[in-house]
């Protein structure tokens, strides 16, 4: 399929740790802006539950986040969810710059009532996703959102941010709780990994 993405460079004199991406294809039109510091979230994808999950990334990830997406939802939500993941990943990669002074690693275990999810992040520069999530059987959709798209979203994010993420769903009965805990745990782990710890690059290779 034809794809075209435009990456916006930060404005002259703009503060670091921010990224902005505009991406338009025959299937979607996506714009993402983020800043790696606490701030407001403005999310609109046409998928209310997905909007709610992206808001969790903003709040628990400690980042100001704007996402505007229009997609061919009459066909399926997959294109929209995946392309938002691509845009978010590219914007995050911009915001991380050369990664000097960052913690690099982040780990979080997040409960939501009966559900418990663990997420681990490494800003390694090598895309990888391990997604161990045996979701509760039966219900597959939450407010029109196909929960299987959660893995597709994370894979797109990982690939384009060039980071390593491990997600382990330890247990959970309520599907909404499990999926929300996945987003919250990933956000908390990202927040820890992107925290500043000094000026040195956290790698013996000299690059990430």
Curated annotation (Swiss-Prot):
The keyword Protein biosynthesis does not apply. It comes from the Bacteria. Keywords: Amino-acid biosynthesis, Cytoplasm, Histidine biosynthesis, Lyase. It is an enzyme of class 4 (lyase). Residues 7-19 have a biased composition (Low complexity). It catalyses: D-erythro-1-(imidazol-4-yl)glycerol 3-phosphate = 3-(imidazol-4-yl)-2-oxopropyl phosphate + H2O. Pathway: Amino-acid biosynthesis; L-histidine biosynthesis; L-histidine from 5-phospho-alpha-D-ribose 1-diphosphate: step 6/9. GO terms for biological process: L-histidine biosynthetic process. GO terms for molecular function: imidazoleglycerol-phosphate dehydratase activity. Pfam families: IGPD. Its EC number is 4.2.1.19. It is found in: Cytoplasm. Residues 1-20 are annotated as: Disordered. GO terms for cellular component: cytoplasm. Belongs to the imidazoleglycerol-phosphate dehydratase family. This is Imidazoleglycerol-phosphate dehydratase. It comes from Anaeromyxobacter sp. (strain K). The gene is hisB.
């Amino acid at each position: 399929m034809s794809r075209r993405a435009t990456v916006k460079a930060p404005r002259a004199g703009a503060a670091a740790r921010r990224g902005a991406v505009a991406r338009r294809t025959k299937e979607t039109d996506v714009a993402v802006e983020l800043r790696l510091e606490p701030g407001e979230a403005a999310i609109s994808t046409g998928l209310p539950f997905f909007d709610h999950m992206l808001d969790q990334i903003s709040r628990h990830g400690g980042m100001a986040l704007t996402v505007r997406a229009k997609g061919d939802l009459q066909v399926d939500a997959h294109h929209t969810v995946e392309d938002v993941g691509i845009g978010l990943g590219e914007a995050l990669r911009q915001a991380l710059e050369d990664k000097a002074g960052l913690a690099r690693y982040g780990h979080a275990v997040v409960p939501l009532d009966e559900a418990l999810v663990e997420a681990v992040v490494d800003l390694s520069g090598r895309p990888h996703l391990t997604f161990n999530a045996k979701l509760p059987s039966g219900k597959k959709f939450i407010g029109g959102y196909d929960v299987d798209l959660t893995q597709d979203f994370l894979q797109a994010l990982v690939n384009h941010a060039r980071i390593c993420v491990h997600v382990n769903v330890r247990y959970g009965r309520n599907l909404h709780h499990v999926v929300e805990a996945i987003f919250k745990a990933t956000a908390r782990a990202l927040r820890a990994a992107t925290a500043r710890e000094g000026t040195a690059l956290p790698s013996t290779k000299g690059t990430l």
